[in-house]
């Protein structure tokens, strides 16, 4: 059973019933829906299409909504694009004008207040670099350092600047509320800068009665500097290497990636590693050697999940990308000593009862050479605590709640199974063991460890461990 989870972005290349089925067969655990593009009507069509496929397949694929986030973009140009030349003067303005080769309008009205002479402004993922010469009212006077073509609506980054723009735009608020109504399992919050940003989204979710979990996307130095607080407030983080690689020097990205994965593991939180993992498979049926090594290294570091973006959204080989990623993950995991890794989980707080029992369960499973840990959970809390320990064997998490089952599909090493409601706890436990037999790793005569909270249904009430020989 593969432990590392695979997230696939749904787009034109994958948004049809045939390909969605192929992605599930190939190993997709989570489907990502990018709200930077498209309308609510289009998003609902995609959501409903995958939901129908998953219903027929009884596949507990988790649904992840990725917000647009607080971003700065250029407005329109005369003719749609211009050519900038190294050394020329170029002005950014907050006035709503039609841009040309000398002057362009930006969407963020307070940018002149947030930048100063000597700073840098990057356009189009850093392909265009401007040096800020001076700021005068609504005008930011610049010199082009790296030139090239610039077209409508390209993104603007300001490395090192602490932008004062609000974290949740009206568009994001509308998107999140819409996502709550549809029933997304996770919200990926773009450009998260602080714990307060996470809490602002949590407030919207609570008001809508949503139990969606929050994955904070770390994409700038503000997020890096506030990483510990963000992890405490969020359910996990995403190492969003695209914008992060624009905001910080490229040589810092691998160092920061390892730091983020390590800190998330220490706090028992989800960590997703994303961006250009198999980028060459947008056009080619095989990845580069560097890409396969990149995927493996993220798994060696301890990432919870690895994500495909354009590869499955608009690439020529979406199914092959997932299969390739799954093969790399399985081979890498076979090389990892999880017993040593479990004992090396550093500084994790196990003072609450569920964490202590979960740790004990994992130790027992190692001692008796269990084929699997089986948990019966109503809230998913026990599964999260078990996953955080990185046990030697897989975790089969049984629940009658389909939404909780989907959420657990983003937990490291957790394999969710939907079981029917039962009249008693013992009936649920028996149903869970029967469900575990459907996995190739669990056969009659094998030893498994069962853990749950009695009575069932109380989050954080894990208090029971049993060692069972499968009949």
Describe the function of each predicted region:
Residues 1-471:
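Non-catalytic helical/linker scaffolds that mediate oligomerization, partner binding
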């Amino acid at each position: 059973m593969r432990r590392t989870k695979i997230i696939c972005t749904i787009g034109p290349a994958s948004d049809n019933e045939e390909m969605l089925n192929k992605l599930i067969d190939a190993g997709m655990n989570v489907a990502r829906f990018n709200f930077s593009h498209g309308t609510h009507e289009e998003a609902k069509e995609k959501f409903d299409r995958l939901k129908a496929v998953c219903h027929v397949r009884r596949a507990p694929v988790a649904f992840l909504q990725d917000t647009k986030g607080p971003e700065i973009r250029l407005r329109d140009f005369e003719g749609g694009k211009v050519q900038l030349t190294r050394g020329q003067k170029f002005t950014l303005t907050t006035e709503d004008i039609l841009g040309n080769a000398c002057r362009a309008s930006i969407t963020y009205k307070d940018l002149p207040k947030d930048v100063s002479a000597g700073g840098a402004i990057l356009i189009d993922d850093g392909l265009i670099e401007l040096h800020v010469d001076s700021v005068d009212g609504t005008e930011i006077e610049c010199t082009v350092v790296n030139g090239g073509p610039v077209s409508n609506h390209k993104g603007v980054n300001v490395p090192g600047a602490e932008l004062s723009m609000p974290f949740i735009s009206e568009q994001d608020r509308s998107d999140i509320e819409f996502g709550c109504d549809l029933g997304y399992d996770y919200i990926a919050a773009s450009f998260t800068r602080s714990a307060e940003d996470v809490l602002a989204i949590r407030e919207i979710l609570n008001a809508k009665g949503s139990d969606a979990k929050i994955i904070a996307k770390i994409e700038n130095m503000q997020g890096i500097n506030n990483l510990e607080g963000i992890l405490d407030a969020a359910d996990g983080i995403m190492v969003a290497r695209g914008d992060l690689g624009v905001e910080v020097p490229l040589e810092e990205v691998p160092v920061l990636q390892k730091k983020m994965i390590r800190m998330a593991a220490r706090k028992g939180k989800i960590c997703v590693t994303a961006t250009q993992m198999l980028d060459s498979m947008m056009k080619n049926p095989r990845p580069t050697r560097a890409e396969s090594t990149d995927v493996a290294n993220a798994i060696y570091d301890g990432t919870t999940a690895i994500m495909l973006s354009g590869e499955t959204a608009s690439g020529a080989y979406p199914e092959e990308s997932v299969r390739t990623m799954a093969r790399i993950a399985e081979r890498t995991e076979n090389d990892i000593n999880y017993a040593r890794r479990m004992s090396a989980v550093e500084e994790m707080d196990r003072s609450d009862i569920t964490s202590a029992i979960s740790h004990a369960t994992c130790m027992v499973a190692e001692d008796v050479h269990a084929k699997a840990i089986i948990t019966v959970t109503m809230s998913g809390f026990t599964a999260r605590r078990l996953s955080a320990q990185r046990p030697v064997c897989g975790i089969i998490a049984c629940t009658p709640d389909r939404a909780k089952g989907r959420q657990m599909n983003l937990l490291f090493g957790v394999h969710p199974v939907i079981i029917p409601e039962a009249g008693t706890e013992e009936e649920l436990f028996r149903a869970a063991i029967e469900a575990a037999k459907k996995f190739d790793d669990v056969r009659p005569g094998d030893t498994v460890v069962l853990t749950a909270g009695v009575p069932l249904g109380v989050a954080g009430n894990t208090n029971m461990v049993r060692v069972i020989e499968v009949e």
